[in-house]
Amino acid sequence: MVEDILAPGLRVVFCGINPGLSSAGTGFPFAHPANRFWKVIYQAGFTDRQLKPQEAQHLLDYRCGVTKLVDRPTVQANEVSKQELHAGGRKLIEKIEDYQPQALAILGKQAYEQGFSQRGAQWGKQTLTIGSTQIWVLPNPSGLSRVSLEKLVEAYRELDQALVVRGR
């Protein structure tokens, strides 16, 4: 089981779709060697060094957290049903209301659209909020994603810089 890493007062909570088998096996988020999450958040400015999956709890030192829409591990995210994503979206709203981070970053357009019953999402900041928490949709850093490392870092850096501008 991959546990959430959450606390009150975070700058951002990154929300993956669901754990892959590597993460489920180790208990650490974004654990597959091909997953670029740790490299991307470092290069985008969220951390001052590249953390390893087993150091995930140190995200809290940087006022960052991690959660997921669906707890069930799969080989690929497309094995998760629309119903699971929708139910996960409802649970996620409750978590975000409890912890009230400055931003929630959903990693993937389809995850956002299905989890929050939205259509036509664009990358970046969304008009929908959860209380005062901004919602951002960022490309998924999975090794299966065709988005380049450069584009991932650019998208995540936009969120980091927006939070800096807000004084967070």
Swiss-Prot record:
It comes from the Bacteria. InterPro entries: MUG/TDG, MUG_bact, Uracil-DNA_glycosylase-like, Uracil-DNA_glycosylase-like_sf. It is an enzyme of class 3 (hydrolase). It catalyses: Specifically hydrolyzes mismatched double-stranded DNA and polynucleotides, releasing free uracil. Its EC number is 3.2.2.28. CDD domains: UDG-F2_TDG_MUG. Its main location: cytoplasm. Keywords: Cytoplasm, DNA damage, DNA excision, DNA repair, DNA-binding, Hydrolase. Pfam families: UDG (PF03167). Gene3D superfamilies: Uracil-DNA glycosylase-like domain (3.40.470.10). Subject to strong product inhibition. N-glycosyl hydrolysis proceeds 100-fold faster than product release. Induction: Induced in stationary phase. One of its GO terms (molecular function) is DNA binding. One of its GO terms (cellular component) is cytoplasm. It is found in: Cytoplasm. GO terms for biological process: base-excision repair, AP site formation. Belongs to the uracil-DNA glycosylase (UDG) superfamily. TDG/mug family. Excises ethenocytosine and uracil, which can arise by alkylation or deamination of cytosine, respectively, from the corresponding mispairs with guanine in ds-DNA. It is capable of hydrolyzing the carbon-nitrogen bond between the sugar-phosphate backbone of the DNA and the mispaired base. The complementary strand guanine functions in substrate recognition. Required for DNA damage lesion repair in stationary-phase cells. Binds DNA as a monomer. HAMAP family: MUG (MF_01956). This is G/U mismatch-specific DNA glycosylase. It comes from Escherichia coli (strain K12).
